[in-house]
């Protein structure tokens, strides 16, 4: 008996060549709808699905393969005598190959003008049913859902006259990954349409972007996956123009740098090391912004990651070229800038859209045995809700410095303290177990520049000791959430030293 293949694909990539190869191996091909028309238009002889089922395609193609003659042929265990007898009695012939990919649901809902009806119509029913049946019976059926696998299958058929068992198992595993991802997209779309924020089960799907050489350390394996609908303003959707392959740590640091630089509408440059900012500068142009980011911490920037929210021009590229950097990420690079920077063969150059994230974005954090899901912290300073509990209000320049420090501090590991002055950070205290410890680090880093600077704290001061350290350093303005039971103690210290203090009412912990 001739072997038979059922071919019905929405992604027509390579299908004509593949079916031609199947026919050359003496395999009969059954097909449906648009796939059948394409194959016949290319001179290939195929059998219509209705000839197998004895039933026409109905309901605009919604029902065409949901038939015992199809699923019996897929699910029958060929060495089971009872199955064989039933097939013979009912006139069911085995199907040995299934070549199916599914209706383009993801592409449909990605369209800005998609309607709910369009989305529903692109939920495939027959396709998933067929490939799941075939994958369950993979001992006897080869099921191909990805055009990438066409060549492998044809090569084994030509060499061995059949598809190897190991390949069948791999193809079956891919089917269930494929259908799981497909169903996850559908369930997530419908969940969002209903406005459900915390469903009883959460199913997420990601697509492999690349294998990484190793993870955070050389002994750890790692892979980079991207979300199917991630914001284009992300490292996952960045275009690499030059340099070595991105590492696990590169991706983390680039993500952190990009998150910070999105906070600014004016020209801004951010330097990051180990996911914490070491220098942030703003200016009238990107060259001035970079100069300030560099001067913020010329030691730590070495080997760092740079993110800019404007095109990198030649003058800025020449300054960047002077030091060792891992990555530069920007909306674009001028032709002259690329010529300068590409002389460093390992320097990674990435382009990406710079758009501030919205609260609709979700942040997923894995913990042992579970997953934490929260909204991204995209909240900006709302001047209509702040309060100034001190006798003195910030000056115009102090306000400018406070706003810069506040934008940055929410991206620093808690406990976090940031000092800013004259359109740049001058000290960053990150990740200490007590707040005053972070303040001391930031003040020490700033040195004499701390005099007349502004300080931002990601959370309230539990005690006035941080205020006292700030006063000793000559800091003149502070922004913090407030809300401590000892706020009055901090206010008294601030008033004693003439420090202007702003309460935002918003905390920005980052762990």
UniProtKB/Swiss-Prot annotation:
InterPro entries: AICAR_Tfase_dup_dom_sf (IPR024051), Cytidine_deaminase-like (IPR016193), MGS-like_dom (IPR011607), MGS-like_dom_sf (IPR036914), PurH-like (IPR002695). GO terms for cellular component: cytosol. Its EC number is 2.1.2.3, 3.5.4.10. GO terms for molecular function: IMP cyclohydrolase activity; phosphoribosylaminoimidazolecarboxamide formyltransferase activity. It comes from the Bacteria. It catalyses: (6R)-10-formyltetrahydrofolate + 5-amino-1-(5-phospho-beta-D-ribosyl)imidazole-4-carboxamide = 5-formamido-1-(5-phospho-D-ribosyl)imidazole-4-carboxamide + (6S)-5,6,7,8-tetrahydrofolate; IMP + H2O = 5-formamido-1-(5-phospho-D-ribosyl)imidazole-4-carboxamide. This is Bifunctional purine biosynthesis protein PurH. It comes from Bacillus cereus (strain G9842). The lineage of its organism: Bacteria, Bacillati, Bacillota, Bacilli, Bacillales. The gene is purH.
